Amino acid sequence: MTRLISSLAVALSAVAVTHAAYPTAPKSTNYVIVGGGPAGLVLAEQLSRSGKNQVTLLEAGPDTINTQLLQTPYTYPIGAVGNVWNYTAQPDPNLGGNAPNMFQGWGLGGGTAINGMAYCRGAASVFDDWAAASGNQGLAWKSLFQDFLEVSHYAETFDAQYGQYVNKSAYGNGLLEVSRTSGLTGFEAPFQQAVEAELGLHEVDMNDGDGIGLDRGISSIFAQNRTRSYSRNTFGILAMARSNVKVITNAWVTKINFNGKTATGVNYQLNGKSVTLAADKVIVSGGAINTPKLLLLSGVGPKAQLSKLGIPVVQDTPQVGLNLRDHPFAVVQLEVTPDIITLWQLTSNTTEAAIAQQQYAKNRSGPLGWNNGFVYATFRVPDSVFDGINGTHYTSMPADRPHVLIEFSGVPFISGGNFSAISTWASLIQPEFTGRVELKSNNYLDNPVINTNYYGTAADKAAIIYGYKKLRQVLAHDTVKVKTVDEFYPGVALNSDDAVWQAIQGQTFSFGHPVGTVAQGKVLNSDWTIKGLKNIRVVDSSTFPFPSSCHPQAVVYALANRAAKDILRDDK
């Protein structure tokens, strides 16, 4: 793998965007990969490595590698705006009719090009349960841990002036570089001290299998030049430097073609024209929203839904689009003292913005190389909270499995306040509820219909109320109070669980972590193929049987690495 990293360095110097789009699209290929996110780009790099396979990757969005706002960590919320599938779910009755936005990455890099760069694997037992659900023992923690080592490496930040627990044995020598932040916003220590005092948690590294505790955060940021480390400028650059790889951007796949039950290729739109690509094998890596959408448009899904829309049924697979889970989070937003560095300061204060720009331009120092503050904690909800309701989903989980994550960021999630804001939130990270993704019509241009069903069971509701109350308990601790000017939201005394619930309903967001809509064990066989079909596989977050207990980008890289091994073994 050290050799691969050296190859990446050579590719970085030799390749800009010359391989980003091909004026003459190929007519056939060994593997077509639909989607240029982390799964698709890892697969492209792995499947092309021997030089024997012709690999074509089709990405609906643009290249992202020269988009400065995405490459600069602190400005990711701004840069992401133009590089997303701007999906909005249906009004959710559990949220009083509010309709969550569910942005997905659009462009090479997918979600890794627009996310907050959190690199976290979470509880080991999640993956052992995935192995049981899927029948693929390669997904068990002991096996998948090797894939985590193979896809990432840790680099020490040269100017970090603070202590942080990092278990360096949990990192390998793969292409993706991860690091800790090079500076602090001023809110990290108060928040950490409050969490330790109020919740009794201690610091861990959630990349070594620990699921519960406090983590000061590892991020997918290059340690030295403080730019985003993501699938496009790691796996993508290496793959795209090879003559047997074709990556075509702005290529929107509209349909998978079949001969009977055998996938034979895809149709896609490029420059206003429909193009047909024949392929020996089709791999769909569009993510948990776009993958089920494409399968449904191609005739793979519930027969009743497809027939209603006039789509010929290739395979009646009722579970396609079902089992949608996410990490919904409910916000408490604070106005903080001027010494805390926030996104508002750097976008509203021209003096602070100029200083930050000068620091970053000079030697990559200063807040522009950070990702807006980054400390989070995870914990379980006591069994007693579920007294009188069916809480088996939560109470039966392995002891290392957390139910709730709390976190903060210097990004104001709630608009309307002209002040320096810190957003804090409580998130259900092992929810019971499931939603679904369906088609609006048989037109590929129409957005899918997304029903989130957040907090959809009595146990979910009890768990998020408990988590939200614990978050506010942390924020009431003296170390945080001295940094707080006012509580912007909810901003009132919440004297009952009903009042807490109303506050949660009023400001719940999607974490952008949808999973499960083409799940292993339900839609897929253990070898990533779709049950009942041939020559088609799915590899992305849609295949998760249920969510990981932390931010999922780290898991997608490892999962794709494991899938590539399985594919190369099976296709010999």
From Swiss-Prot:
Pfam families associated with the record: GMC_oxred_C, GMC_oxred_N
E.C. number(s) listed in UniProt: 1.1.-.-
Active site: H513 (proton acceptor), H551
Keywords assigned by UniProt, alphabetized: FAD, Flavoprotein, Oxidoreductase, Signal
Phenotype caused by lack of the gene: Significantly decreases the production of dibenzodioxocinones by approximately 67% and significantly decreases the growth rate.
PROSITE patterns: GMC_OXRED_2
GO molecular function: flavin adenine dinucleotide binding; oxidoreductase activity, acting on CH-OH group of donors
Top class in the EC scheme: oxidoreductase
Functional pathway: Secondary metabolite biosynthesis
Induction comment from the UniProt entry of this chain: The expression of the dibenzodioxocinones biosynthesis cluster is positively regulated by the transcription factor dibT.
Job description of the protein: Dehydrogenase; part of the gene cluster that mediates the biosynthesis of dibenzodioxocinones such as pestalotiollide B, a novel class of inhibitors against cholesterol ester transfer protein (CEPT). The biosynthesis initiates from condensation of acetate and malonate units catalyzed by the non-reducing PKS pks8/GME11356. Pks8/GME11356 lacks a thioesterase (TE) domain, which is important to the cyclizing of the third ring of atrochrysone carboxylic acid, and the esterase GME11355 might play the role of TE and catalyzes the cyclization reaction of the C ring.
Family that this chain belongs to: Belongs to the GMC oxidoreductase family.
Protein name: Dehydrogenase GME11362
Organism in which the protein naturally occurs: Pestalotiopsis microspora
